[in-house]
Amino acid sequence: MRRYLFMVLALCLYRAAPLEAVVIKITDAQAVLKFAREKTLVCFNIEDTVVFPKQMVGQSAWLYNRELDLKTTLSEEQAREQAFLEWMGISFLVDYELVSANLRNVLTGLSLKRSWVLGISQRPVHLIKNTLRILRSFNIDFTSCPAICEDGWLSHPTKDTTFDQAMAIEKNILFVGSLKNGQPMDAALEVLLSGISSPPSQIIYVDQDAERLRSIGAFCKKANIYFIGMLYTPAKQRVESYNPKLTAIQWSQIRKNLSDEYYESLLSYVKSKG
């Protein structure tokens, strides 16, 4: 109760200074229901917030650490490509779990409030099917809530932009691709909102990444949109428990069981989408 009183007080102070962004810590995803209303856009970051790989080696942190390791022997571009290929291979193999068991109830509540809801995936567009498959296994369907815009390309791949740099919305999930292309979330939101005739009056963003929430808050301040960043502490604590020594063992065991043909097929898959 005290936590919610603090959140209400923070929001009141925020209303008094409409250009300021608020970031609050939450332990339960149901907290969004306290503030969401019609014309609110509620965003849920998927990777390492909504769902987690059961093995640490499948986390985003492993991808970043693996890239650093590979940079000692490969060029920066080669290291990024190889690390992502290896991480993608793992993402098809590991099991996943839902961080918030009551997320379905939260989505139902947001639907009743007529709030816009958007899942945010940091994966590139050629992993759309894999991401949707993972969410379906938990009966998580973002299309059960009102959509702020239709599915489709936000930035279509052209001769000047690769498939990895493209952004798209599928099943009410925005695929940003930052795990592959480094696209910042504030830039992605700018592209999203530029194509919307009726922008949201407020954005609520649920994530475990405090820095990402701060950058989105700065963008919303410039765009004159109320912003409430919700730092989801159960997911944040899990990210912080990442153990590179443990993942090194997991990666070693996985690599022993994967053939060259497996990674060659993945590489062919990526190139065919490019």
Curated annotation (Swiss-Prot):
Keywords: Cell outer membrane, Membrane, Signal. This is Putative outer membrane protein CPn_1073/CP_0776/CPj1073/CpB1118. One of its GO terms (cellular component) is cell outer membrane. It comes from Chlamydia pneumoniae (Chlamydophila pneumoniae). It is a peripheral membrane protein. It comes from the Bacteria. Residues 1-21 form the signal peptide. It is found in: Cell outer membrane. InterPro entries: DUF2608. It holds the Pfam family DUF2608.
